[in-house]
């Protein structure tokens, strides 16, 4: 068990190397309902703490899960629509379908950075709800498309609409949860992605039987569009904008929830302003670009397989209806991979990068099997396709690295924006690796997938080594052990043992937080802050 080190309130670092880690404390901000500076800590018993955390989980996790489920369904139903007449009804030729797939990410890229600014500045619950109304309307209007131009336009707008969802959910998660809880909670709501794949497959299978003058693919977008629009009302009523106005908690519970993320999270996200010095720090931080590169290389395979999945399955000899059902076991494997790796990453602070390496190995094998499809039975090729299903689990692990290792609202949101620039770039490039001239084998695409994931392994190992070196250097320079479960120096103690939830509750009850502990400070300037890897 690590030992807590008492430090005076006016503690200052004297050496030149340490002085770079300390920033001047600005004037205290206004904190609204949470929490009065320099006051007594919120005292909550261990059983009560577990009950409050469950209450928070049951309020937030279902909402985030369902939102992300619709986020995935509305985006990827295109793959099912493609085998139910969308290409023919919109007269798509040659690479037109690839452009329809990838233009979504141009819209996403266009709105990515502006929306991260708005998430940090606006009431996040209301902003997400209003965005969902627009998003649902765009999905429903896709059914009215009858040309390549119309489809391109509506898909671009869908990218704009959905650009808010992932960054907002990441922001909400880091607002409410500790560094040890973030990977597991991210895994829970991100699993909605794969459950959405199952629901979308069943929906496509059911709607595919409709014999109507309105073709099945149009009904898919109508049903999903209306459902998404209605979801907006639920989010408007139930998602709190911040901890201090969460009406489902009492004032003392809100204080406890706010204190725990200051002690064991990545700091308070309330009453902050956009700080351009944090943007510069993010851009100059080596771990920013290592994580960015890993995200880009993981998303290139995702962009292609996500949009060409049903076409690849159909090439194995299955019809349109069968190809939609075959995606169900694929999605189930994906759910297991996302949930399992999220739980492990939350339980063990040095497993995140190792898990990324482990989950990208099966897709390499799967791509090799599909590439050799002419020499092997269709059943083996289908098995190779199922091996691709662990690849999407890399993104929530990368998100967790960002949420847990970046402190400072502006720095974290800048990194979030960069993360989704990589997400867009990979998903724009991915579909164009599936060349229509190589249909149905797509040799270039599956060769590229193998190369991308091989490079991911190299970069992730480099990131692990870098973060280990930085942790050791900071420990030597600061003279403080620190740990990867706390937010660093808070109150009159540092190195608070937060090995599990009981330690967090004990720390919240005992540590007298000061007004400066709620200030918006980056990870590089937080004494005792150590990185997870």
Predicted regions and their residues:
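Glycine-rich segments within core transmembrane alpha-helices of 12-TM secondary carriers
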Residues: 183-213, 227-228, 416-430
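Conserved MFS/SLC helix-loop-helix module at the cytosolic interface between two early adjacent transmembrane helices
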Residues: 110-149
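Helix-breaking motifs and short loop linkers at transmembrane-helix boundaries and internal kinks
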Residues: 90-91, 114, 122-123, 144-150, ...
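Intracellular terminal tails of multi-pass secondary transporters
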Residues: 1-70, 94, 236-268, 443-533
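Extracytoplasmic gate region of multi-pass secondary transporters
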Residues: 79, 277-342, 399, 431
